[in-house]
Amino acid sequence: RPPRSTRKESSAASDVYKRQIMHGAKMDAGAVAGVTTVQSPIALARAVMEQSPHVMLASRGAEQFAKEQGIPEVSPKYFETERRKRALESYKARKQAGIEPHVDYKFGTVGVVVLDSKGNLVAGTSTGGMTGKRWGRIGDAPVIGAGTYADNRSCAVSATGHGEYFIRHTVGRDICARMQFAGQSLQAAAEAVIMDELVVAGGDGGIVAVDASGEVSMV
């Protein structure tokens, strides 16, 4: 069940969720986007990975697959919180007043990275997206190599931030590639991408990651 506090209201009346999970052993992955009635979108993402030949399902197709997999269905109102309603109202008021709204990326995304006893690396990311986003917008969370990535040869990464920048710069994959091909440590690779490359591009955000030796990085 997704934490209710992760919900970010869109500028429309209802909202959508994005989830992804990736297993670093065989590069298996499952992702969903644009779902509004699935009680546990991360469970649906795992079902896509394990019970289908696909990597990503979206919108009604994803919700239909959830029904086929027996994943509980709920009303979109199930996810609503007063805090997020207030955040949306504040966003709209600032936009109407011609003030650039501030989006705090430290809240709203749940990320997990795992190194198991067999040496497998797994990453998962769950989010309701950016407050005030355009209806239909999909961010980095369900995009493999952007908001989520796992490879047993390097590391597992889960990210949060301004998704468009994370997609353009393939943040998750870039961190893993720097370790695999440039020989950088996890911390050095993460800092280079988040603190240097992303900042220069005008983006903002952070990551949590773990490598094959168990080193953890939060940047």
Region annotations inferred by a language model:
Residues 2-13, 17:
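Single conserved hydrophobic/aromatic residue that forms the stacking wall/gate
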Residues 15-19, 26-107, 173, 184-219:
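C-terminal binding/interaction regions
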Residues 20-22, 113, 158-160, 208:
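Residues in well-ordered beta-strands of folded domains
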Residues 26, 120, 128-129, 162-164, ...:
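Short, glycine-/Ser/Thr-/acidic-enriched flexible segments
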Residues 94-134:
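Internal active-site segments that recognize and position negatively charged phosphoryl groups
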Residues 106, 114-117, 122-123, 142, ...:
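Zinc-dependent deaminase catalytic domain
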Residues 127-168, 174-179:
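Conserved mixed alpha/beta catalytic, RNA-binding, or beta-rich assembly cores of soluble enzyme
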